[in-house]
Protein backbone atom coordinates (compact mmCIF):
# COMPACT_ATOMS: atom_id res chain seq x y z
CA UNK A 1 0.00 0.00 0.00
CA UNK A 2 2.87 2.37 0.81
CA UNK A 3 4.48 1.67 -2.55
CA UNK A 4 1.24 2.45 -4.41
CA UNK A 5 0.76 5.70 -2.51
CA UNK A 6 4.40 6.58 -3.17
CA UNK A 7 3.98 6.02 -6.91
CA UNK A 8 0.84 8.16 -7.01
CA UNK A 9 2.24 11.05 -4.99
CA UNK A 10 5.58 11.07 -6.77
CA UNK A 11 3.99 11.03 -10.23
CA UNK A 12 1.54 13.82 -9.40
CA UNK A 13 3.75 16.07 -7.29
CA UNK A 14 7.47 15.35 -7.09
CA UNK A 15 7.94 13.91 -10.59
CA UNK A 16 5.28 16.04 -12.29
CA UNK A 17 5.96 15.94 -16.01
CA UNK A 18 5.22 19.64 -16.57
CA UNK A 19 6.20 21.36 -13.34
CA UNK A 20 9.35 19.36 -12.57
CA UNK A 21 10.57 17.75 -15.80
CA UNK A 22 9.15 20.30 -18.29
CA UNK A 23 7.81 17.56 -20.59
CA UNK A 24 4.75 18.33 -22.71
CA UNK A 25 5.09 22.12 -22.70
CA UNK A 26 3.69 22.70 -26.24
CA UNK A 27 0.14 21.42 -25.58
CA UNK A 28 0.38 22.82 -22.06
CA UNK A 29 0.86 26.35 -23.40
CA UNK A 30 -1.49 25.97 -26.36
CA UNK A 31 -4.57 24.45 -24.73
CA UNK A 32 -4.51 26.23 -21.38
CA UNK A 33 -6.69 29.18 -22.40
CA UNK A 34 -9.98 27.70 -21.13
CA UNK A 35 -10.48 25.43 -18.14
CA UNK A 36 -12.82 23.00 -19.91
CA UNK A 37 -10.45 22.59 -22.86
CA UNK A 38 -7.49 22.18 -20.50
CA UNK A 39 -9.41 19.55 -18.53
CA UNK A 40 -10.32 17.71 -21.74
CA UNK A 41 -6.70 17.74 -22.90
CA UNK A 42 -5.54 16.57 -19.48
CA UNK A 43 -8.00 13.69 -19.48
CA UNK A 44 -7.00 12.71 -23.03
CA UNK A 45 -3.31 12.74 -22.03
CA UNK A 46 -4.11 10.75 -18.87
CA UNK A 47 -5.99 8.14 -20.89
CA UNK A 48 -3.20 7.90 -23.48
CA UNK A 49 -0.53 7.70 -20.75
CA UNK A 50 -2.36 4.86 -19.01
CA UNK A 51 -2.83 2.89 -22.24
CA UNK A 52 0.72 3.66 -23.39
CA UNK A 53 2.17 2.50 -20.07
CA UNK A 54 0.26 -0.78 -20.34
CA UNK A 55 1.10 -1.32 -24.01
CA UNK A 56 4.75 -0.32 -23.63
CA UNK A 57 5.09 -2.68 -20.67
CA UNK A 58 4.02 -5.57 -22.92
CA UNK A 59 6.20 -4.36 -25.80
CA UNK A 60 9.20 -4.02 -23.49
CA UNK A 61 8.76 -7.66 -22.45
CA UNK A 62 8.72 -8.67 -26.11
CA UNK A 63 11.77 -6.57 -26.99
CA UNK A 64 13.89 -7.91 -24.16
CA UNK A 65 17.56 -7.02 -23.82
CA UNK A 66 18.39 -8.00 -27.39
CA UNK A 67 16.38 -5.22 -29.00
CA UNK A 68 16.58 -2.62 -26.23
CA UNK A 69 18.07 -0.14 -28.70
CA UNK A 70 14.71 -0.14 -30.55
CA UNK A 71 12.77 0.78 -27.42
CA UNK A 72 12.21 4.49 -28.12
CA UNK A 73 11.16 4.00 -31.75
CA UNK A 74 8.76 1.19 -30.87
CA UNK A 75 7.30 3.19 -27.98
CA UNK A 76 6.62 6.12 -30.33
CA UNK A 77 4.83 3.79 -32.77
CA UNK A 78 2.72 2.33 -29.95
CA UNK A 79 1.84 5.80 -28.65
CA UNK A 80 0.95 7.01 -32.16
CA UNK A 81 -1.42 4.07 -32.60
CA UNK A 82 -3.10 4.74 -29.26
CA UNK A 83 -3.51 8.44 -30.06
CA UNK A 84 -5.17 7.59 -33.38
CA UNK A 85 -7.70 5.39 -31.58
CA UNK A 86 -8.39 8.13 -29.00
CA UNK A 87 -8.76 10.70 -31.78
CA UNK A 88 -11.32 8.54 -33.63
CA UNK A 89 -13.20 7.95 -30.36
CA UNK A 90 -13.36 11.66 -29.50
CA UNK A 91 -14.38 12.60 -33.04
CA UNK A 92 -17.36 10.22 -32.84
CA UNK A 93 -18.29 10.59 -29.16
CA UNK A 94 -17.38 14.15 -28.12
CA UNK A 95 -17.13 16.29 -31.28
CA UNK A 96 -17.06 19.56 -29.30
CA UNK A 97 -13.96 18.46 -27.36
CA UNK A 98 -12.44 17.14 -30.59
CA UNK A 99 -12.90 20.58 -32.19
CA UNK A 100 -11.65 22.43 -29.10
CA UNK A 101 -8.45 20.39 -28.89
CA UNK A 102 -7.81 20.90 -32.60
CA UNK A 103 -4.24 20.26 -33.69
CA UNK A 104 -3.13 19.52 -30.12
CA UNK A 105 -4.92 16.16 -30.07
CA UNK A 106 -2.73 14.50 -32.74
CA UNK A 107 0.26 16.22 -31.13
CA UNK A 108 -0.22 13.99 -28.07
CA UNK A 109 1.72 11.49 -30.20
CA UNK A 110 4.81 13.64 -29.89
CA UNK A 111 4.04 14.84 -26.37
CA UNK A 112 7.21 14.29 -24.39
CA UNK A 113 5.18 13.59 -21.25
CA UNK A 114 3.61 10.46 -22.75
CA UNK A 115 6.90 9.12 -24.09
CA UNK A 116 8.60 10.20 -20.87
CA UNK A 117 6.18 8.13 -18.79
CA UNK A 118 6.93 5.02 -20.84
CA UNK A 119 10.69 5.57 -20.71
CA UNK A 120 10.74 6.41 -16.99
CA UNK A 121 8.77 3.23 -16.33
CA UNK A 122 11.17 1.19 -18.46
CA UNK A 123 14.21 2.48 -16.60
CA UNK A 124 12.83 2.34 -13.05
CA UNK A 125 14.06 -0.49 -10.84
CA UNK A 126 13.85 -3.79 -12.67
CA UNK A 127 12.08 -2.13 -15.55
CA UNK A 128 8.55 -0.83 -15.71
CA UNK A 129 8.31 -0.07 -12.02
CA UNK A 130 8.88 -3.77 -11.35
CA UNK A 131 5.44 -4.81 -12.59
CA UNK A 132 2.46 -4.18 -14.83
CA UNK A 133 0.18 -2.55 -12.26
CA UNK A 134 2.78 -0.10 -10.88
CA UNK A 135 3.71 1.01 -14.40
CA UNK A 136 0.07 1.61 -15.38
CA UNK A 137 -0.52 3.36 -12.06
CA UNK A 138 2.46 5.64 -12.73
CA UNK A 139 1.02 6.43 -16.17
CA UNK A 140 -2.39 7.31 -14.72
CA UNK A 141 -0.91 9.37 -11.89
CA UNK A 142 1.49 11.11 -14.28
CA UNK A 143 -1.48 12.02 -16.47
CA UNK A 144 -3.37 13.31 -13.45
CA UNK A 145 -0.34 15.43 -12.55
CA UNK A 146 -0.33 16.77 -16.12
CA UNK A 147 -4.06 17.51 -15.78
CA UNK A 148 -3.57 19.25 -12.45
CA UNK A 149 -0.83 21.47 -13.86
CA UNK A 150 -2.68 22.38 -17.06
CA UNK A 151 -5.95 23.17 -15.24
CA UNK A 152 -4.17 25.26 -12.60
CA UNK A 153 -2.30 27.14 -15.31
CA UNK A 154 -5.55 27.72 -17.25
CA UNK A 155 -7.16 29.09 -14.08
CA UNK A 156 -4.27 31.47 -13.48
CA UNK A 157 -4.26 32.51 -17.13
CA UNK A 158 -7.99 33.31 -17.07
CA UNK A 159 -7.57 35.27 -13.86
CA UNK A 160 -4.64 37.29 -15.22
CA UNK A 161 -6.46 38.05 -18.51
CA UNK A 162 -9.43 39.64 -16.68
Locate predicted features:
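C-terminal ends of transmembrane helices
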Residues: 22-37, 83-97, 153-162
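C-terminal transmembrane helix-loop-helix hairpin of multi-pass membrane proteins
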Residues: 129-162
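Helix-coil boundary and interhelical linker segments in multi-pass alpha-helical membrane proteins
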Residues: 1-5, 58-70, 118-136
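Membrane interface segments of multi-pass transport proteins and intramembrane proteases
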Residues: 60-70, 91-102, 161-162
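Generic transmembrane alpha-helix signature in multi-pass membrane proteins
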Residues: 22-30, 87-93, 104-105, 112-129
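Cytoplasmic-side transmembrane-helix entry/capping segments in multi-pass membrane proteins
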Residues: 36-47, 69-75, 97-109
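A generic, lipid-embedded transmembrane alpha helix
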Residues: 43-60, 110-115
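Structural signature of hydrophobic alpha-helical transmembrane segments
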Residues: 3-18, 66-79, 136-149
Amino acid sequence: MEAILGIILSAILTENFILVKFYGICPFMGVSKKIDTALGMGMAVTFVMALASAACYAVNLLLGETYAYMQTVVFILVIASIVQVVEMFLKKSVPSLYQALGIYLPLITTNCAVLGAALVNAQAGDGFRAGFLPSVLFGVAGGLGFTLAIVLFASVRIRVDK
